[in-house]
Swiss-Prot record:
PROSITE patterns: OMPDECASE. This is Orotidine 5'-phosphate decarboxylase. Substrate binds at residues 40, 62-64, 93-102, 227, 245. GO terms for biological process: 'de novo' pyrimidine nucleobase biosynthetic process; 'de novo' UMP biosynthetic process; sporocarp development involved in sexual reproduction. It comes from the Eukaryota. Transmembrane segments: none annotated. Belongs to the OMP decarboxylase family. GO terms for cellular component: cytosol. It comes from Emericella nidulans (strain FGSC A4 / ATCC 38163 / CBS 112.46 / NRRL 194 / M139). Coiled coil: none annotated.
Length: 274
C-alpha cells in the first residue's frame, strides 16, 4: 500500500499539499465514509434524486454526464447545489483520451463545461504524457476558476476482464502522476501503486487510490466486469471505493449505500488500526 495509507484520513488531510485531496480526506473523516457512488443513470431527475438521497452517506458522486438524455444547465447547477448541501465532491468519469489540444477544449469549454462543475476528472494515458500535461496546463488559464479545487485521477488499471491497462502502461501512469503531482491527485486502480518504479518515489508521496467495481453481492457481469468487496478493495490499498449498480439498482438505494459505507469504513479502520 502507499506509504501513507496506514495513516488516518484526518492526518493525511492535515499534511497533504494538494488542497482538493486535503478536502477529500476531510470530507471522508467528517462523514465517516469512503464511498463513491457511480450514478450511471440516464435522466437528470434520476441523477439529482440519487444525489440528494445518497449525498449524506458518500464522499464523492461519480457521473457520466454525457449519458443523460435531458442534460441542461439547470441539471448542473442543481447538482452543484446538492454537492454543497451534502458536502461531497463531483467526479466526472470522462476518461479523457486524445491529443492535448483536444482534451483542453473538452475539459474547459465545449457543451459540457466540465471544468466549471466537476471537482475531479480522469484520463487514460494512451496518448502519452501530453494528455496529462495539457490538462494540468488548462488549470493555469487566466479564465480558469477554482483551480485549487480541481484534480485529475489517472486511469492506471481497470477491473474489466482482459484489461490492457497493465505492466508498462501502469508504470507510465505512476511516472506521469509524479511529474504532475500538483494537479494529479492519484489513480483509479485495483490496488495501491506505491511500489511501482520505487526508485522514483519521494518519501512525502501520498496519491489517492480509487477502486472501481466494488459490489457486496455479485462476482461480475456478462460484459466482463469483475467485482470485489469493500473489504478486499480497501485491503488492497483503495482509499475510496466506487460502487454503482450494487447501490443505485438496489430495492432501497439508501439502505444499500449505508451498508457499503459501514463495510468500507470498517475495512478502513482495520487498515489504519483504529
Amino acid at each position: 500500500m502507499s506509504s501513507k495509507s496506514h495513516l488516518p484520513y484526518a492526518i493525511r488531510a492535515t499534511n497533504h499539499p494538494n488542497p482538493l485531496t486535503s478536502k477529500l480526506f476531510s470530507i471522508a473523516e467528517e462523514k465517516k465514509t469512503n464511498v463513491t457512488v457511480s450514478a450511471d443513470v440516464t435522466t437528470s431527475a434520476e441523477l439529482l434524486d440519487l444525489a440528494d438521497r445518497l449525498g449524506p452517506y458518500i464522499a464523492v458522486l461519480k457521473t457520466h454526464i454525457d449519458i443523460l438524455t435531458d442534460l441542461t444547465p439547470s441539471t448542473l447547477s442543481s447538482l452543484q447545489s446538492l454537492a454543497t448541501k451534502h458536502n461531497f465532491l463531483i467526479f466526472e468519469d470522462r476518461k479523457f483520451i486524445d491529443i492535448g489540444n483536444t482534451v483542453q477544449k473538452q475539459y474547459h469549454g465545449g457543451a459540457l463545461r466540465i471544468s466549471e462543475w466537476a471537482h475531479i476528472i480522469n484520463c487514460a494515458i494512451l496518448p502519452g504524457e501530453g494528455i496529462v500535461e495539457a490538462l494540468a496546463q488548462t488549470t493555469k488559464s487566466p479564465d480558469f476558476k477554482d483551480a485549487n479545487q480541481r484534480g485529475l485521477l489517472i486511469l492506471a488499471e481497470m477491473t474489466s476482464k482482459g484489461s490492457l491497462a497493465t505492466g508498462e502502461y501502469t508504470a507510465r501512469s505512476v511516472e506521469y502522476a509524479r511529474k504532475y503531482k500538483g494537479f494529479v491527485m492519484g489513480f483509479v486502480s485495483t490496488r495501491a501503486l506505491s511500489e511501482v518504479l520505487p526508485e522514483q518515489k519521494e518519501e512525502s508521496e501520498d496519491f489517492v487510490v480509487f477502486t472501481t467495481g466494488v459490489n457486496l453481492s455479485d462476482k461480475g457481469d456478462k460484459l466482463g466486469q469483475q467485482y470485489q468487496t469493500p473489504g478486499s478493495a480497501v485491503g488492497r490499498g483503495a482509499d475510496f471505493i466506487i460502487a454503482g449498480r450494487g447501490i443505485y439498482k438496489a430495492d432501497d438505494p439508501v439502505e444499500a449505500v449505508q451498508r457499503y459505507r459501514e463495510e468500507g469504513w470498517k475495512a478502513y479502520e482495520k487498515r489504519v488500526g483504529l
